[in-house]
UniProtKB/Swiss-Prot annotation:
Higher taxonomy: Bacteria, Pseudomonadati, Pseudomonadota, Alphaproteobacteria, Hyphomicrobiales
MF terms (GO), sorted A to Z: N-acyltransferase activity
SUPFAM superfamilies (alphabetical): Acyl-CoA N-acyltransferases (Nat)
Keyword Hydrolase carried by entry: no
Record domain N-acetyltransferase: where: 1-99
Keywords: Antibiotic resistance, Plasmid
Residues that span the membrane, as ranges: none
GO biological process: response to antibiotic
Name of the protein this chain belongs to: Kanamycin resistance protein
InterPro entries linked to this entry: Acyl_CoA_acyltransferase, GNAT_dom
Length: 108
């Protein structure tokens, strides 16, 4: 079973930029873990979202204990911004800006 969530607009109450999108993904089949599928999925989703010229930033918030997800997002170009408190508990706030995305594409 796979879950992919996209949110349009504000992810955090402090976020006022209408071009921000939030993502979350889950690969629930344990036999699929560790094969790079999550990273491929996130990279493809980031590229799809940045195809929209209005998208300025993509953000996500994995649990600090979910080291596999944090590494997946880092490999896909997200950077840690710090730890935030959410209704679900603490989370690692991670972002990828359009500028960073375009910079990595031009380096490739």
């Amino acid at each position: 079973s796979r879950t992919l969530l996209l949110e349009r607009g504000r992810w955090w109450e402090e976020e006022t930029d209408p071009g921000v999108r939030g993502i979350d993904q889950s690969l629930a089949n344990a036999s699929q873990l560790g094969k790079g599928l999550g990273t491929k999925l996130v990279r493809a989703l980031v590229e799809l979202l940045f195809n929209d010229p209005e998208v300025t930033k993509i953000q996500t918030d994995p649990s600090p204990s979910n080291l596999r997800a944090i590494r997946c997002y880092e490999k896909a170009g997200f950077e840690r911004q710090g730890t935030v408190t959410t209704p679900d508990g603490p989370a690692v706030y991670m972002v990828q800006t359009r500028q960073a995305f375009e910079r990595t594409r031009s380096d490739a």
